């Protein structure tokens, strides 16, 4: 484990990414408080603001806030329906511009990324930050801004990035540490939520200064895992990287518009979501051993899972989904108002590691279904749109099912077919 002696990492976070992209694309929104809602509906009061502009944040609004609450805080709030494909294209265009100044090391989410610094960037990080900002302004637009942090490692650079938002630059040279940290509350440390903060307080750790002086093994015991110890080393400027994890699941969820909250419409939506999840799974070369269905109602929640014989074709996935809905029908209230539905394919195995069950998933029917799904995928890719589907395909109002606004997953163009 190595402790950096100079700044080595850049962390970039776009300011109010979704709303600022909309303001750049729609001049009539510029300078106005904007709230992004998940779908176009005449009953906007029944939904939530899922992202908002800096003008809306200045008025007290926040991401994931009920529309009535947001309008109480900011009566001038302009509600705009999300445009995930626009966000995807903006993300790709912005990455291209940043890459012209410095190679991108890791894309953390649709609006955050990290870079390793070369000798010229280490010598003059402020100049690099200014070049990135100017390139974005000149080639993309002035309404999309970013905040940039420089530090010894990625963890500290992320914290520095949050210090001067929006459109700021913060440089934490190792020789100046830990001074800048001590002015921050514990909750500003990535990974310290309310539960962990309560544990720290119970151990008489009330500030980052207290945390700094705590032994790393003690933090490991307070966290209950190695993350507490890793966090201590990251705060102290060590080059810490988490062990890469494999793909765990493919899934989609959808908030249903008011006129789609009956069981038949919810089932139709889940069918579409599952087809898209299965298509993503095939694209990445995985098979699933379990399907889960979850339903959020005004009257409560219901969820269940069904084992699968290591499959990836639409026919097998949709057959299992029908079985889960048949089970759900026995438990849901007769007139259940379903607010949200979701599906998850998990217990994944890569194609090269797939264990076949000779009785269930290696017969002629299964092979035909897999060939059929692969052929459908190829046709849709060839024509660049959805030309063939297995059964009915009726997206819910608002569109973008399976291609929704995303922080931790950047949709591909195929997710919008």
Predicted regions and their residues:
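Acidic, metal-coordinating catalytic segment for phosphate/diphosphate chemistry
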Residues: 310-417
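Compact, charge-rich alpha-helical regulatory domains located at protein termini
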Residues: 25, 104, 138, 150, ...
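Short acidic, glycine/serine/threonine-rich loops at helix termini
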Residues: 22-23, 47-51, 156-164, 242-246
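Catalytic palm subdomain of template-directed nucleic-acid polymerases
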Residues: 114-133, 164, 204
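Residues that scaffold, gate, or flank divalent-cation-dependent active/transport sites
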Residues: 1-110, 114
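DNA-contacting surface of Y-family translesion DNA polymerases
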Residues: 2-4, 11, 188, 201-335
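Short Gly/Ser/Thr- and Asp/Glu-enriched loop/turn motifs at secondary-structure junctions
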Residues: 108-112, 151-154, 286-290, 336-340
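A residue-level signal for conserved active-site and pocket-lining positions in enzyme catalytic cores
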Residues: 13, 60, 70, 111, ...
């Amino acid at each position: 484990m190595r402790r950096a002696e100079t700044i080595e990492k850049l962390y970039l976070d776009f300011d109010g990414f979704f709303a600022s992209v909309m303001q750049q694309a729609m001049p009539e929104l510029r300078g106005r408080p904007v709230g992004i809602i998940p779908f176009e509906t005449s009953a906007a009061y029944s939904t939530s603001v899922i992202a908002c502009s800096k003008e809306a944040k200045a008025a007290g609004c926040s991401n994931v806030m009920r529309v009535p609450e947001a309008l109480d805080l900011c009566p001038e709030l302009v509600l705009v329906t999300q445009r995930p494909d626009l966000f995807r294209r903006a993300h790709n265009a912005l990455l291209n511009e940043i890459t012209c100044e410095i190679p991108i090391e890791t894309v953390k989410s649709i609006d955050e990324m990290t870079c390793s610094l070369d000798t010229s960037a280490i010598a003059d990080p402020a100049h690099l930050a200014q070049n990135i900002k100017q390139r974005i302004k000149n080639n993309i637009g002035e309404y999309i801004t970013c905040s940039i942090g420089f530090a010894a490692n990625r963890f500290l650079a992320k914290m520095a990035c949050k210090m001067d938002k929006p459109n700021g630059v913060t440089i934490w040279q190792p020789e100046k540490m830990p001074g800048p940290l001590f002015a921050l509350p514990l909750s500003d440390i990535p990974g310290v939520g309310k539960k962990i903060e309560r544990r720290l307080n119970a151990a008489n750790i009330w500030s980052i200064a207290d945390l700094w002086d705590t032994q790393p093994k003690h933090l490991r015991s307070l966290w209950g895992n190695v993350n507490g110890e890793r966090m201590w080393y990251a705060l102290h400027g060590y080059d810490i990287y988490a062990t890469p994890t494999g793909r765990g699941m493919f899934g989609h969820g959808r908030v249903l518009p008011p006129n789609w909250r009956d069981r038949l419409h919810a089932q139709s939506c889940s069918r579409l979501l599952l087809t898209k999840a299965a298509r993503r799974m095939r694209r990445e070369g995985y098979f699933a051993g379990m399907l889960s269905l979850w339903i959020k109602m005004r009257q409560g929640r219901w969820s269940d899972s069904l084992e699968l014989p290591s499959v990836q074709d639409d026919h097998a996935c949709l057959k299992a989904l029908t079985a889960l809905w048949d089970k759900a029908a026995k438990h849901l209230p007769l007139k259940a108002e379903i607010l949200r539905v979701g599906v998850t394919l998990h217990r994944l195995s890569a194609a090269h590691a797939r264990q076949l069950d000779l009785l269930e998933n290696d017969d002629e029917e299964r092979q035909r279904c897999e060939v059929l799904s692969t052929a459908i995928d190829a046709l849709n890719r060839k024509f660049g749109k959805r030309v063939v589907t297995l059964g009915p395909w009726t997206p819910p109002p608002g569109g973008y099912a399976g291609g929704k606004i995303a922080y931790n997953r950047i949709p591909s163009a195929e997710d919008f077919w």
